């Protein structure tokens, strides 16, 4: 079932002029792209497909922590690329509260993965 679905998606992405233009932009390392319109799991599918043509780190920014977690889970299902959630700090800078040790560790782990040069997909909430 997944193979048939994947073949149809590959056909769509290979014949879509809009996708080819978007991929050309995405392959430029200095380019920032804002994608709006796709809903549900199509957005992570599109992001995973675009990232598959790039040999660099990609940053996906979401409005909320929950949406970041959903996008991360979807990306892990749609792509073979490494996907990492860079969690929200949990406090505002002016609050003076410290984040938990596990949260700090999760963030440091993502930062250490970035240092390896792996073409990672990092998902982070605002």
What are the residue ranges of the model-derived segments?
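ASCE RecA-like P-loop NTPase motor cores
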Residues: 1-126
């Amino acid at each position: 079932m997944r193979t048939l679905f994947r073949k149809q998606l590959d056909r769509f992405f290979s014949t879509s002029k809009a996708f080819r233009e978007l991929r050309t932009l995405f392959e430029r390392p200095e380019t920032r792209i804002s994608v709006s319109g796709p809903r549900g799991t199509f957005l992570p599918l599109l992001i995973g497909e675009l990232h598959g043509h790039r040999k660099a780190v990609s940053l996906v920014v979401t409005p909320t922590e929950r949406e970041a977690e959903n996008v991360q889970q979807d990306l892990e299902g749609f792509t073979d690329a490494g996907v990492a959630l860079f969690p929200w700090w949990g406090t505002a800078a002016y609050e003076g509260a410290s984040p938990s040790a596990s949260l700090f560790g999760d963030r440091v782990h993502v930062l250490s993965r970035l240092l390896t040069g792996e073409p990672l997909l990092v998902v982070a909430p605002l």
